[in-house]
Amino acid sequence: MQLRSALMTGVARRTIFEPALTLSPEVVAWINDIAASRGPFQSRVGDKPLSVSMEGLVWQHESSAIPMFDCVWDLGGETVVLSLSRPLVEALVSTVQSGLAFPTEPTASLILELALEPLIARLEDKTNRTLHLLRVGKAITLAPYVELEIVIGPVSGKGRLFLFSPLDGLVPFAFRALAELLAQLPRQPRELSPELPVIIAGEIGTLRASAALLRKASVGDALLPDISPFGRGQIALSVGQLWTRADLEGDHLVLRGPFRPQSRPLECAHMTEIESQLRPSDADLDDIEIVLVFECGRWPISLGELRSAGDGHVFELGRPIDGLVDIVANGRCIGRGDIVRIGDDLGIRLRGRLACND
């Protein structure tokens, strides 16, 4: 019996879908924090202003039209790879000596480390570890990486901070320290797209009823609302914790004020009174809940087949189950992602930004 159970367990495990990528819960928390939209880091390199902005996390490697150079750093025994575009490397070199030809190793490492010495000193002070540039060479490191927009004086370019490996364990100290430093930058929530769909509910009345009354209710019983603006030709429109009123004109609803915060709009019996003209704040809008649905596919089916489908019916997906997952909000696809393992559970890793915050 034990042998049979072991064999059955082995078969079951082989049939369970296993994502190509496994992330530990700690790594997921770190990724979500590092990829958050924040204000730029601002400082100076020599006599030139420096600005570094986080552009997001890139999972699928993208070739660069502009030559990139891997700058391999050692922070207290841990390796960190930061790739910079050639114009950025040249801009850093010019802060040490203008007109200097593009250097080769080991000169390149020495000059870049000298150019970044004030920033290096600040990082060493905050981490209590030594930071040293090991080498600079042609970019060969592959995704995933955090994409950076870097501006040095009049020169702008891309930077790539490559993630550690593996991603199913602990976050290395160097990257934890980086997240702590970035956490000091103010968050800047991305603007919501005006095309993001939300669901508005039209409410015609409310009724306070006891559980005993509901248990006794049967077919044919009539329920009389306590509050029913519908009898006055009005309907309450609600989305999340926001509401407004509208007049019913034929098969149209005409708004009679902006949406504003109120937890239970129909508990206010005086809907015809003059309402506050204050529009909802960003915080009010942020509280609106939007259900995200993760879809592995859609396919047409006839009503006849649907009626006859019973236990054991087989639907053909027409695509591999480990393909891209559609992220749907109120019927609209706003993004795509890959299935990944997070500890004992499955999650969805975004392939790009959601359409609602482009």
From Swiss-Prot:
Biological processes, Gene Ontology terms: bacterial-type flagellum-dependent swarming motility; positive chemotaxis; protein secretion by the type III secretion system
InterPro entries, per the entry: FliN-like_C, FliN_T3SS_HrcQb, SpoA-like_sf, T3SS_SpaO/YscQ/SpaO
Pfam families reported for this sequence: FliMN_C (PF01052)
Keyword Glycosyltransferase: no
Claim: Lipoprotein is one of the keywords in the record: no
Domain of life: Bacteria
Keywords noted in UniProt: Plasmid, Transport
Example GO molecular function: cytoskeletal motor activity
GO CC annotations, alphabetized: bacterial-type flagellum basal body
Coiled-coil residue spans: none
Family: Belongs to the FliN/MopA/SpaO family.
The protein's role, per its UniProt record: Could be involved in the secretion of an unknown factor.
Identification of the protein by name: Probable translocation protein Y4yK
